[in-house]
Amino acid sequence: MVYLVHQNEWRSVWVKTLAKLNKNVLINISYHGTKFHGYAVQNDYETVQSKLQDALAWIYESKIYVNASGRTDKGVHAINQYISFYIDDRISLEKLREILNRYGQNKWYIKWIKEVDRNFHARFSAKAKTYLYLIDYCANNPLFYDHAWIVNFQLDFNLIEKAIPILEGTHNFWSFSTADKDKGLRTIHKIDLKQEDNKVYIYITGDGFLRSMVRMIVGALYNIGIKKYDLNHLKWLLDNPKKGRAITKAPASGLYLYEVYYE
């Protein structure tokens, strides 16, 4: 593993006796999804969680487990991910942010770190999340290949807008998930659709999401937009939940964790 921070600088923050980890902190972090093999720790692969925990272990000489607002799959980006963990007082929060950003080697950027209540948990304290999905018609520009779903033809925007109210509200979304068990009851508060130039922005806000749920919802809207199936079929998918029944899963490259909401 390559470190951008010189080892002597790391040693300057060490202490001979490990202090009690008594400070609960929250970070706001953005990252490029294609630089990691997802968020959660996986053997033999670099993930956001593993790299962050390695950095904290190096600084604090102790295993520190971090908790994110939610996991992101390989290739999925984060504009505003939130991660909480316990540390001690050996260095300031601003110094910690600076060191972690250098350790990230331009794969992530930590915007801020702040102390939070000891009972705060990045995942369990979250009330809602917004995901952004980006579709781009600019198929000849390779700069966008890792940042959007490249589509070679125009979608029927009016049909997609008509499909949105069907998906909003509380439903069993198991047909829009790759989860093995039927725990599909979720509430989508709002879906916003915006088209600018050659790009389509889909914002989906809900109280929680199943595995692959956002990507399969986008896949369903795509199928509506190309007239592969109609609005009645979309209703049928909700009324007859079964794992993966919606079939089409939009590419990870277009998905962004946009915001997480706390009280």
From Swiss-Prot:
Coiled coil: none annotated. SUPFAM superfamilies: Pseudouridine synthase (SSF55120). The active site is at D73 (nucleophile). GO terms for biological process: tRNA pseudouridine synthesis. Pfam families: PseudoU_synth_1 (PF01416). It catalyses: uridine(38/39/40) in tRNA = pseudouridine(38/39/40) in tRNA. Keywords: Isomerase, tRNA processing. Homodimer. Formation of pseudouridine at positions 38, 39 and 40 in the anticodon stem and loop of transfer RNAs. NCBIfam families: hisT_truA (TIGR00071). This is tRNA pseudouridine synthase A.
